[in-house]
Amino acid sequence: MKFVPCLLLVTLSCLGTLGQAPRQKQGSTGEEFHFQTGGRDSCTMRPSSLGQGAGEVWLRVDCRNTDQTYWCEYRGQPSMCQAFAADPKPYWNQALQELRRLHHACQGAPVLRPSVCREAGPQAHMQQVTSSLKGSPEPNQQPEAGTPSLRPKATVKLTEATQLGKDSMEELGKAKPTTRPTAKPTQPGPRPGGNEEAKKKAWEHCWKPFQALCAFLISFFRG
């Protein structure tokens, strides 16, 4: 009779052992990694498998700072690397170091290449596939095409001044030459001796205010 309770106890112990889930390796998918970037953004990195046997892994990075929160996602097949298959922890730690050196974790590293799997090929690396920071303006962005510049206006003014100068030169070239009026020959005036005589006559016979007129008339009629 004692055999039956012992058999039941052994059976229950075996069932309890089978019901326990296997312990996950440290650094495998499902674990969270907390870190801080060079710009002091607080971030969390979460790797997750797409399914058993798929071999494809998604890596989610969520960050926040005093001004904003942002995120990005990476995709790859690190299981193709033998070092990752043996122990995934060094792979994720090296990916974490790459993100930690950035000012913003989702900008500046489109591909994560952990050194333990660098020779395994591009499929074993983590490629960034989406980010909330995509399309954000860069610091040294060029001015928009609609922004007017001052140089074309100066060029237009210079061109207009040049054209006005050309038009003025053409008008001067077409202008008719001006002819100077020919001087008419002057008639010979009365002789000096006649003038003196006319003045003398006018002084003798004319009233003082009209002496000049009288002298002129006397000289004119005497020729």
UniProtKB/Swiss-Prot annotation:
Residues 1-19 form the signal peptide. It is found in: Secreted, Extracellular space. It comes from the Eukaryota. Pfam families: FGF-BP1 (PF06473). Expressed in serum, peripheral leukocytes and cytotoxic T-lymphocytes, but not in granulocytes and monocytes (at protein level). Keywords: Disulfide bond, Growth factor binding, Secreted, Signal. Disulfide bonds join 43-63, 72-106, 81-117, 206-214. Belongs to the fibroblast growth factor-binding protein family. This is Fibroblast growth factor-binding protein 2. It comes from Homo sapiens.
